Amino acid sequence: MAHHDPINLMTPPAGLAQLNERSREIFRQIVESYLATGEPVGSRNISRLIAVPLSPASVRNVMADLEQLGLIYAPHTSAGRLPTEAGLRFFVDALMQVGDMTEAERQSIQSQLAAVGRAQSVEAALDEALTRLSGLTRAAAVVLTAKSNTRLKHIEFVRLEPEQALVVLVGEDGQVENRVLTLPPGVPSSALTEASNFLNARIRGRTLAEARLELETALAQDRAELDQLTQKVIAAGVASWSGGDSDDRQLIVRGHANLLEDLHALDDLERVRRLFDDLETKRGVVDLLGRAESAEGVRIFIGSENKLFSLSGSSTIVSPYSDATGRIVGVLGVIGPTRLNYARVIPTVDYAARLLSRLMGG
């Protein structure tokens, strides 16, 4: 079952431990009503919902205490109450019962991943995992892959035009990456073949970072043995791999449209528009997901805990996945409104990440 460590990025309200059972029950009803409808809930409705018979006036007194603790607040448009982000964090960490996936849901992910896994394409497996995850959680599914950790198996240069070639990098995990390369004038096909042979003799089993270091040394030592144009092809090929940190990681997003469902107000629409913009530009998303790579199990970032980009009003639930050596090679999860169905989403993300690890031999 999924586990999740409390992430104390915000100061927990004082006195939570002193909440009595009646206060917890009223608070739970406010949160569960919010997660179900997105709407504030008033004392009259709560007095009908709770198991213990209490008058609306008594409920209002408890709500005033909860508000004092920073767990709920009154939006200016309503007499009802909504949970604060700190309240949601308290609910997720202390009160929520994490559910379990149905057998049908497990099979839905497992059968599809097994099918693409047989095709030996990591990218296809990631894509399928995201499609299933976004479908089951009704949120946007995201994966961050650490491409720089992929160990190389093979490289090939394919000429596209007289002064342009495609560099095809194949990883040991089956991942394929293509980059377009500008060639020096007058490069013959023999130079492309020689460059491929030179590189393949030295890069197999190395990560991109290791291969770059190895090749810089090898080029300096073996310069006399190589044709000048071949040297230029190799140098250009190595340069094309080192396109900066953003190229070392790949962010894939599926299920954007889920974020447009069930919007309640213009401010919801504005929040989703900002989120789309962040996902499109990768602004902060890569950093946020990267923080989950160092943790075991599911990590949950609620609202403004997503300090790295403008995700207030949104939550992120992510889990790392591993390769055959047990090394974490990426992070899988979902991004959605703060009123995500946490009890359902947490085990789903956990299961998908475990399946992906198994598929990759982890």
From Swiss-Prot:
GO terms for biological process: negative regulation of DNA-templated transcription. The keyword Transcription applies. Keywords: Repressor, Stress response, Transcription, Transcription regulation. The keyword Metal-binding does not apply. GO terms for molecular function: DNA binding. PANTHER family: HEAT-INDUCIBLE TRANSCRIPTION REPRESSOR HRCA. Belongs to the HrcA family. NCBIfam families: hrcA (TIGR00331). Negative regulator of class I heat shock genes (grpE-dnaK-dnaJ and groELS operons). Prevents heat-shock induction of these operons. This is Heat-inducible transcription repressor HrcA. The lineage of its organism: Bacteria, Pseudomonadati, Pseudomonadota, Alphaproteobacteria, Hyphomicrobiales.
